[in-house]
Amino acid sequence: MNWLNQHKKAIILAASAAVFTAIMIFLATGKNKEPVKQAVPTETENTVVKQEANNDESNETIVIDIKGAVQHPGVYEMRTGDRVSQAIEKAGGTSEQADEAQVNLAEILQDGTVVYIPKKGEETAVQQGGGGSVQSDGGKGALVNINTATLEELQGISGVGPSKAEAIIAYREENGRFQTIEDITKVSGIGEKSFEKIKSSITVK
């Protein structure tokens, strides 16, 4: 007990020194630690990811039916983004009778569409569908795809004026694609009588 009293100050000083030393070591160690940096994707990495996504989309297979003045008419598998010119090439090219002036070779193909290459002198009102199809009903005139047709193309249908054409596009934008040609009767202003007049001129594919 006497020893503790005699050395009390020394013990307190030693303890204080130890605590002070520990604090200094802790502070020094904390300063040397670098903050953890979160990995941020670089612009190059983002570009690579976008390119891979685009490649996946372009690798999707579609099926088209090419008819008319080509070497090998038939059903062919194509890739998303392919154009009419590529479909013609896959069918062996056009025949000597082909009238390419009536065909939009740069048009993009859609799955399930018909590409028709007319012959020279053939009287067909060939119309280019918005999705890359060149559709024809055997020389009697082209069918208008009501899912892709523009305002002008819709007005080209006998019995469809500007107001009905606008109504068709408005319905399409609000409700999506027409599943059957009969669905057009759901459009305001187009009843059964109107449908009977236009059904032979329209398609949904």
Curated annotation (Swiss-Prot):
Q: Name one GO biological process term.
A: protein secretion by the type II secretion system
**Topology versus the membrane:** Single-pass type II membrane protein
Domain spans labelled HhH: 142-171, 172-201
Key words of the record: Cell membrane, Competence, Membrane, Repeat, Transmembrane, Transmembrane helix
What induces or represses its expression, per the UniProt entry?
Expression activated by ComK.
Please give the GO cellular component terms listed in this UniProt entry: plasma membrane; type II protein secretion system complex
InterPro entries, A to Z = Competence_ComE (IPR004787), Competence_ComEA_HhH (IPR004509), Endo/Exo/Phosphatase_dom_1 (IPR051675), Hlx-hairpin-Hlx_DNA-bd_motif (IPR003583), RuvA_2-like (IPR010994), Soluble_ligand-bd (IPR019554)
Q: Name the major location.
A: membrane
Keyword Protein biosynthesis on entry: no
**What is the annotated localization of this protein?**
Cell membrane
Topology Cytoplasmic: residue spans: 1-9
Q: Which residue stretches are annotated as topological domain Extracellular?
A: 29-205
Sequence intervals crossing the membrane: 10-28
SMART domains linked to this entry = HhH1
The molecular function GO annotations come to: DNA binding
Tell me, in a sentence or two, what this protein's role is.
Needed for both DNA binding and transport. It is absolutely required for the uptake of transforming DNA but not for binding. Its role in binding may be indirect.
Q: What is this protein called?
A: ComE operon protein 1
Origin organism is: Bacillus subtilis (strain 168)
